[in-house]
Amino acid sequence: MLFAVECVYYHAMNTPEAVRMVLDTIASPNLRVICDLANYVGPENASVDAQRRLWDKVGSWYGDKIAAVHFKGQSFKPDGTLCSTRLEDSCVDYRGGFEMLRTLPQPVLPVLREEAVPARAASDLAFMKSFF
């Protein structure tokens, strides 16, 4: 049986460092990571450069432990408040994130669309496919 943890910006395990600490502390071959790229991004690290540094850490520190990828759109209002967006309008650096994911040893990674809106399925699928 496998068990997976997920970094969530607004929770206790909210940075690559925190995920790495949990993985190192538990040290189980059955512990994996669900990688939701949006969950690593907050208003202070929403720039592409800051996100590329995050993706470098995720890939090098525990990329081989990633078992699935979540995909959702988000952005931040001027006051820093999180808001859901269409994938095309997201502040998430999906290009950089998927460049990192393509370097991992896993032959296949399931990608799960979160917060899906059926009316946008075609545009969501086209957007996601642009990274493969």
Give short role names for the model-derived ranges.
Residues 8, 81, 116-117, 126:
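Intrinsically disordered, low-complexity regions of eukaryotic proteins
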